[in-house]
Each structure stands twice: as C-alpha cells, then as structure tokens.
C-alpha cells in the first residue's frame, strides 16, 4: 500500500517524507490523533495495549531505523539492513513510532539509586556535536519531573530523544524532537513534554 502522509505533523497523522539538509531521505511517523492503524495493522483502541511489542524495520543500508524500546538486533543484508526494536512494557499503539534517516547515536547515562540508566539519543550525523552539548540537559529535566511526579516509568526500555523534521511528540521511550536544539524556547513556553517525561 501507500502509507498516509502527514499534512501538518504531529497534529495531522501519517508519515513525513522529506530530505535532510544534505538532500538525503529523512522519514518519521506521527499518529497520535488518528491512531496507529494509519500505518500498520493492529487493534487500534485507546484501551488496547500490547504487553510488549517487537518491531522490525528494513531500510536501505545507507539509512538507520529508530523505534521504541531497546535495539535488539541489526541484520545487514547487503543493500538493506533490518533493525529490531523491543518494548518490554505495555504501550499504546499510537505511541509506537519509527524514524528513518542518517542517524548517529549520542550516548549518555543517568545515575539514580545506584543504578545506571542509558540514554541513547539519535540525531542526524551533521548535528552530533550540537546535540552532544544539548542533550545532557534532558537529565536535569528528568530529575525535576521525578522529584515532583514520580519515577520515569520505562527505564527497562530506555530513554531516547530522536531528531525529526517536525516539532516532536512524546512517543514512549523514543521521544521525537524537532525543536532545533533550543531548550530555552521550550522552557519559556512550558513546552517540556518534548522530553517525554
């Protein structure tokens, strides 16, 4: 089939098909309003949560596919590569997302109660240095929210921010972020959900 395109993401659901500044494919899905049925078959009801989800995305080998949860396997098949992601916690279908692009990982850790939690953020390769200086602020935001609202619920599935070509959305364990690496604008507008906490 032909996947639905998003006219005004993330408010209008579907895929965003675009190019990055180096004219390479950059793809992301948002489906919070319409539901996940617009891009994959499922029992799409707000009360229906899978107790876990395993998703495999196969993309051209020059691209990387980022999903919710933890990366379990990468299988290179020559011209294509498959990325297997696994969410071990219950998740609403509309929170499941995929982002595809020339991503690199910016890794960090959060120490809490003598446990190390990994934070693997994914950004376009030419934004790695900028993101490396920006994303450490997400630890401060998580600590703030945990102080007032309780623990982050999905440490087992990790925490990541994924750069996208729209403003972003709070997908469980794979928060999409398109705010141009400017936390101060978000703080002023009280738009902290970009951190998904």
Residue ranges and their predicted role:
Residues 1-103, 107:
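Extended, low-hydrophobicity, Ser/Thr/Pro/Gly-biased non-transmembrane segments
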Residues 55, 84, 104-197:
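Juxtacatalytic substrate-recognition/specificity segment
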């Amino acid at each position: 089939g032909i996947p639905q395109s998003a006219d005004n993401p993330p408010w209008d659901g579907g895929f965003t098909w675009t190019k990055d500044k180096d004219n390479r494919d950059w793809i992301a899905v948002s489906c919070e309003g319409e539901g996940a049925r617009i891009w994959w078959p499922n029992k799409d009801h707000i009360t229906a949560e899978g107790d876990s989800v395993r998703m495999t995305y196969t993309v051209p080998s020059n691209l990387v596919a980022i999903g919710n949860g933890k990366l379990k396997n990468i299988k290179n098949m020559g011209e294509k590569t498959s990325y297997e992601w696994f969410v071990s916690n219950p998740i609403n279908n509309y929170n499941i997302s995929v982002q595809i692009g020339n991503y690199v990982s910016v890794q960090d850790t959060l120490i809490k109660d003598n446990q190390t939690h990994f934070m693997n953020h994914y950004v376009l390769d030419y934004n790695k240095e900028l993101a490396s200086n920006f994303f450490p602020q997400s630890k401060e935001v998580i600590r703030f929210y945990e102080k007032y609202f309780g623990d982050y619920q999905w440490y087992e599935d990790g925490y990541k921010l994924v750069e996208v070509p729209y403003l972003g959305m709070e997908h469980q364990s794979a928060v999409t972020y398109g705010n141009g690496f400017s936390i101060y604008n978000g703080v002023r507008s009280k738009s902290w959900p970009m951190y998904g906490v």
